[in-house]
């Protein structure tokens, strides 16, 4: 009886860990922290803090530097 319970617990642990690993890989692909950060290269026009994509450097005189 005890052996059946141990086998059942082991199988459940294996199923749960496989399921969690599969979902963690999906989360990594969708995570914005993992994705490459986009920024404007030097010479591109910029508009300060209100623009959606920031400069890679600094916005000076409406141009990224």
Swiss-Prot record:
Notes concerning its domains: The presence of a 'disulfide through disulfide knot' structurally defines this protein as a knottin.
Compartment(s) where it occurs, according to its Swiss-Prot or TrEMBL record: Secreted
A GO-annotated cellular component: extracellular region
Keyword Cell membrane: no
Name this polypeptide is given: Hainantoxin-X
Organism: Cyriopagopus hainanus
GO molecular function: calcium channel regulator activity; toxin activity
Summary of the function given for this chain in its UniProt record: Reversibly blocks N-type calcium channels (Cav2.2/CACNA1B) in rat dorsal root ganglion cells. Elicits no toxic symptoms in either vertebrates or invertebrates during a period of 48 hours post-injection, when it was assayed in vivo by direct injection into mice and cockroaches.
Intrachain S-S bonds: 39-56, 46-59, 55-64
Family: Belongs to the neurotoxin 36 family. 02 subfamily.
Source organism superkingdom: Eukaryota
Tissue: Expressed by the venom gland.
Stretch forming the signal peptide: 1-20
């Amino acid at each position: 009886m005890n052996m059946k319970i141990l086998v059942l617990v082991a199988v459940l642990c294996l199923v749960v860990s496989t399921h969690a690993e599969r979902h963690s890989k999906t989360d990594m692909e969708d995570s914005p922290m993992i994705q490459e950060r986009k920024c404007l290269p030097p010479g591109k026009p910029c508009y300060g803090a209100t623009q959606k994509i920031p400069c890679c450097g600094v916005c000076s005189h409406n141009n990224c530097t």
